[in-house]
Amino acid sequence: MMGSPLRVLLALPLALALRVDVSRPRTNDWKRTQCGGPSGSADLPTQWAAQVTTTSPPLPEFPRPSLVRGGSDRDRGNQSTWSTLNGIWEYAPADPTAPPPTGKTLEQSILVPFPIESCLSGVAPNSTAAYVNRSWYRLEVTVTATAGTRQLLHFEAANWQTTVYVNGRLLGNHSGGYDRFSVELTHEIFGASASRSAFSGSASATLELLIGVYNPADRGAQPNGKARISAITSPGGDTYTPASGLWQSVWIEEVPAAFIASVQLDANTSHLTATARIDDASVSAANMVKFEVIDPASKAVVASGHSLAGSPLRLAIPSARLWSPGAPFLYDLRVSCDACHDAVLAYFGMRTFTVANVTTPSSGGYTQVHAALVKGGDLLVANLTVKQAEAKCDATAGCVGFTFEASASAGVHRTYLKGGQLKFTQPAAEAWQSFVKLPAKMPRPLLNGGKIFLAGWLDQSYWPDGIYTAPTEAALTFDLEAVRTFGLNTVRLHQKVNSERWYYAADRLGVLIMQDAVQKYGRASNATIPLFESDLKRMIEQRSNHPSIVQWETFNEQDCWQVFKTAPHAVADIVRLARATDGQHRPVDTDSGGGANGLPVGDVNDIHSYPYPRPVLPTARRYAMIGEFGGIGYFARGREWVPGKCHTYLNASSPAKEADIYVNMTRQMIDLAPTGLSASIYTQITDVELECDGFLNYDRTSKFTPAQTAAIREANEKLIAVASAQ
C-alpha cells in the first residue's frame, strides 16, 4: 500500500530484532472434526477451511493494523518487532483442584486461535456432556531479544477468564472474553537468560507458556452473547455453540523501554485530535510526541505538530478528504517519540456521524406511509388504498385488515388507529393503511452533515468451522464485501466483538458498523452488572478509533437490561458510560427492540418488527430505526447445520420467493421513510446453526442466482437513495 519513501520515514530510531523460535508439539495429533451440529449430522465447512493446516500458522496477518510499529505494512507488520504464536499448542482439560501442570507435556494438540468447540480446533466436544469449561494450553518458545527493549505477550481475545504462567511464574490474570490484554516477558527473558547470542546486546531464553482458561458460558454471570452449552447437543432457534479459550491471535512484540502504548483519535470533517500514551517506567509525562498526518497517495505530510504524552493535540487538516461508504479515504498518522526511540503508524478517517433535527419535505401535510395486503405470510401488493385492499379480499381469500385515520391535531406526530376488522373473518391476511402528520423538523442521522439512510443486515459473525473465528483473512473480509455485493451500507454486529482486522476491513471498504455490547442473553443477574460495564468500557476504548463504527448498541431486546434499574447502574447510567468512554461522541441506541427503548435516553427509537416492517416514528430527540426485521428463510438442502431442523420467522418456498419478498419489503421501507424512518436492519447476513434466515447459507454459499442478487442490490440501492433524500 505504501511506497518506499514512507517506509524510510517510518524507520524506528531504535533497531529492534526480535526472534522467536517455537517448539511445536506433534502435529499428527491434530485433525479437523465434523463442522456441523450434533455428532452424526452434517459436515458443513466453508470453502476456506481447507486452507487451514498445521504446516503454517493460521491467520498470520498482523493482529493490530491500527498501530504498526516501525513499518507501514498493516498486513505483515514489521517482521523484526513481532512474531505470531498461532498454530499447534499442547492442550488438556483442567482439573480445578490440581496445580498448574508446569513442565508437563499435555496430552492433546489444539490449533490456536480457534475456539475449543470449533471443528478447526481439533478438540471440539461431541456433546453437551463432554463440554470442558477449564483448559490448559502449553507452548515452548525460545525468544532472542535486543538489550534495552521489552517483550510483550499479547492475547487479542480469550474467553473468558485467563491465567498466564511463564516458566512456572504467574504473570497475570484477565477476565473478559472480547478484549485485548497483555503480559510482559522481559524479566523472564533477561532475568533468566539461558544463553548469550553471538552478537552482543541481546539475550536468549526458552520460555514455557502455560495458559489456563475458564469459560462457564451461559452458566456464569458474564456477558456471553447467545452461546448455550446445551446447543452442542441440542441447537436452539437463536442460541448457538459456545466459543471458549484462545479465539483470537496470540503474539509476541518487542518494544523500546519507553514505548507508544496507544493513540486515541477523534476526527471530524476538518480537524484531528490525537493523544498518545507512553508506557514508561520512569517519566512518561515529560516525553514529547510528534504527530504527522500523511496522505497515503502522495506520501506528503499534510499536517504536523507536537504535544506532551497524554495531552491531546488538535490538528487542522487542509482540504480534508472525507470518509464515507462511497469514498472510504484513510489518512496515515505517524506518531514518534524521539526520547523513547519509538515510532508507530496509525490511521484515521475524517467523518462525523450525528443526530440532528432537519427540515421535513412536505412538512405540515399528511403522508400515507404504509399500505399493504398480506396473505399467508406473503406480501401480495404494496401501496394499496383501503378500497383497493377490500376489493382484493373476498370470502375465499379471507383477509383481515385495519385502517388508520388521518384526523390529528396540528403538529401532532403520531399514528392513529381506527379500529376494526374488515368484513372477512379468516385471519390469513392483513391490509392496513397509515397516515402521519409531518412536523416541520424531525431527528435524522447525518453523515458528514448530510442525511443518510442506513440499510444493513444483522451480522452475528458465527462460522460453521471456526464458531467465533473466521478460518482465514479472506473469509473474514468476505462477509463485509457481501454487504456491498447486495447493495447495503451497514452492518449491525450483534452480540459480539470481532477482531481488529475485521474493523480495519470495514474501514477500508466503507461499511458502516453499529456495534452491539455483548449481552447476558436472558440470564442476567446482579453479578452481571460490573462484568457488563467492564466489557462495554473496554470494547469502546479498544475500537473507538475505527471510522466505520458509527453507533453503539448498549442493550438488546429483553436480554439483559432489566437488572440495570438502580443508580449508578441504571440504564441511563450505562448510556452515559458509553458516551463518556467514546471520545467521538457517537449516537447510542439504548435498547434495540426492547423495553428500555421506551426510556427517554439515548439517540434512537428502535423497534423490532418480524417479519414485515411496520411504522416507527422519531421522538423529539431520537431518530427512528427498525433494528431488526425480516427473517425470511429458504432452507437449502445440503447446507443445513442439522438437516431438516431449520427454522425462521417466515419460510420461503424458493430463493426466488425469498428475493421477491425482500424486494417488496424495501418498497415498504421507502413508504415509511417520509415519516422519519432512517435505518433498517434485516435479519440476517447468513444462516446461523438452526436459524436459517440468511442471504447466505451458513457455509457462505449464496442462496441466490446472479440475477436475483442483482435485483436485491438494485432494490437496496434505491432504498438508500430515495430514503436518504427524505
Specify the residue positions occupied by each region the protein language model found.
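Surface beta-strand/loop "capping" patches
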Residues: 254-283, 719-725
